[in-house]
A protein has these predicted regions:
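Phosphate-backbone binding interfaces of nucleic-acid-interacting proteins
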Residues: 1-111
Length: 111
């Protein structure tokens, strides 16, 4: 399926910095609850992400990530997920997070 450039412009993809991470104990599949600061316009958003193979709460805090910020909220195992943190999904289902190659400002648009 093709989308137009106008369709793509509707997707709010932003840079954010991980502030807090904890294990989502209620999730069926191993997941982390991640709080990300997307800057003054978007603010702090929360996500439940299946990213436990390569990432722990300790090694994620302070890292910058890329997220889709304008999806509707979704309840995942008792957690309100407000943003989709983006990652590359390997053949075995492991997720490698997408991130800026250098430190940048929170809230910047990804195009």
């Amino acid at each position: 399926m093709e989308i137009t450039y106008d369709d793509f412009k509707k997707v709010q993809i932003k840079v954010g910095t991980v502030l807090e991470v904890k294990v989502n104990e209620k999730a069926r599949k191993p997941s982390l609850i991640v709080k990300v600061d997307f800057g003054k316009d978007i603010g702090i958003k929360q996500s439940s992400a299946q990213i436990t193979h390569y990432y722990t709460p300790e090694n994620l805090v302070g890292k910058q990530v890329i997220g889709v910020c304008n999806f509707p909220t979704k309840n995942i195992a008792g957690v309100v997920s407000e943003v989709l943190v983006l990652g590359a999904i390997e053949k075995d289902g492991k997720v490698v997070l997408v991130h800026p190659s250098q430190k940048t400002d929170n809230g910047l648009d990804i195009a």
